């Protein structure tokens, strides 16, 4: 059942009230470990006062005082953790699928793949968003966000 228009407006107002008060979301680090290694997330997102998120105009990156996301994943640990949720006869498929995702992510420059780990670093530095040290033009990010938003409405 869709949300009522009034409820959507109230949620938008509440979201803007939170955003206008410069919230900061920070996990330093959030991790799960086992004897093989860990899966860790460092996240730090802080908004400027009264941010304006408008995909039609420039300045998207200027809406953040701070923005960084770092994933550090030990492959053996990830497989060990995920395999607990997969039936025994599908565990080999899990390893195969994970290898496929890693190869695809590496080929697209989204992740850095080493023998034991997969990492991703997304950080705002001097008003430039960088993925694993490489700048991402604001227009390119807007296209991705637009596709994600439109995909969400299409469901």
From Swiss-Prot:
Xref: InterPro entries: DUF945 (IPR010352)
Pfam families in the cross-refs: DUF945
Alphabetized UniProt keyword annotations: Signal
Record's signal peptide: 1-19
The keyword Signal is annotated on this UniProt entry: yes
Protein name: Uncharacterized protein HI_1235
Native organism: Haemophilus influenzae (strain ATCC 51907 / DSM 11121 / KW20 / Rd)
Lineage: Bacteria, Pseudomonadati, Pseudomonadota, Gammaproteobacteria, Pasteurellales
């Amino acid at each position: 059942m869709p949300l009522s228009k009034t409820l959507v407006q109230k949620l938008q107002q509440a979201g803007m009230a939170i955003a206008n008060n410069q919230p900061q979301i920070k996990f330093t680090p959030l991790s799960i470990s086992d004897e093989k290694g860990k899966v860790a997330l460092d996240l730090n997102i802080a908004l400027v006062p009264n941010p304006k998120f408008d995909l039609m105009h420039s300045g998207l990156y200027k809406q953040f005082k701070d923005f960084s996301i770092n994933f550090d994943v030990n492959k053996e640990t990830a497989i060990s953790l995920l395999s607990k949720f997969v039936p025994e006869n599908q565990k080999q498929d899990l390893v195969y699928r994970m290898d496929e995702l890693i190869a695809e992510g590496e080929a697209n420059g989204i992740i850095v793949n080493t023998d034991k780990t997969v990492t991703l670093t997304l950080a705002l530095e001097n008003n430039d968003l960088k993925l694993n040290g490489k700048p991402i033009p604001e227009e390119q990010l807007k296209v991705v966000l637009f596709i994600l938003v439109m995909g969400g409405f299409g469901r």
